[in-house]
Regions:
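Short helix-capping/hinge SLiMs at alpha-helix to coil transitions
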Residues: 27-33
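Short amphipathic alpha-helical interaction segments
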Residues: 47-58
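Minor-groove-contacting beta-hairpin "wing" of winged helix-turn-helix DNA-binding domains
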Residues: 69-80
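Exposed, interaction-prone assembly regions rather than primary DNA-binding/catalytic cores
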Residues: 106-129
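A short acidic, leucine-rich amphipathic alpha-helix
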Residues: 37-44
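Short, amphipathic alpha-helical interaction segments positioned at domain boundaries
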Residues: 83-106
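Short alpha-helical segments that sit at the start of domains
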Residues: 1-24
Length: 129
């Protein structure tokens, strides 16, 4: 059985109609070279972009479908091999590390105390005098 047929059969097992529809459409896009742009997937499924994004997330998290995407390659696809898997996984790890660093900075950032905010700032004259 080829991978497209495998995922087509897996999509038929999904009970939610919208999720099943997106899964069936994705079964035609196995391998990075067969990536589908989000806009094309939205048009094909007749759903909104936010809804399709959420469904793709559901396919990954709830149904454990290996759907890939990464910077430098437009579109989404079902990961077909270990090279694609690790490329996507490493990019996700990099993004995770960036988010973690940003979170730490925000957690530790100095916030002006209420007293600092309540201080009256003298208004400068019209010509800086």
């Amino acid at each position: 059985m080829n991978p497209n047929d495998y995922y087509r059969l897996k999509s038929a097992e999904i009970t939610e109609a919208d999720v099943r529809l997106v899964a069936a459409c994705m079964s035609d896009h196995v391998g990075e070279e067969n990536a589908v742009r989000l806009e094309a997937l939205v048009a094909r499924c007749g759903l909104g972009e936010r809804q399709v994004r959420d469904i793709l997330e559901t396919l990954v998290k709830a149904y454990r479908w290996p759907i890939g995407a990464h910077a430098g390659k437009a579109g989404r696809w079902i990961i077909a091999n270990d090279k694609e898997r690790w490329h996507v996984a490493n990019e996700l790890l990099s993004r995770e590390n960036e988010l973690r660093a940003r979170r730490r900075i925000i957690e530790q950032a100095h916030l002006p105390a209420k007293l600092e905010l309540d201080k009256q700032v003298p208004q400068m004259g019209l010509f800086g005098s």
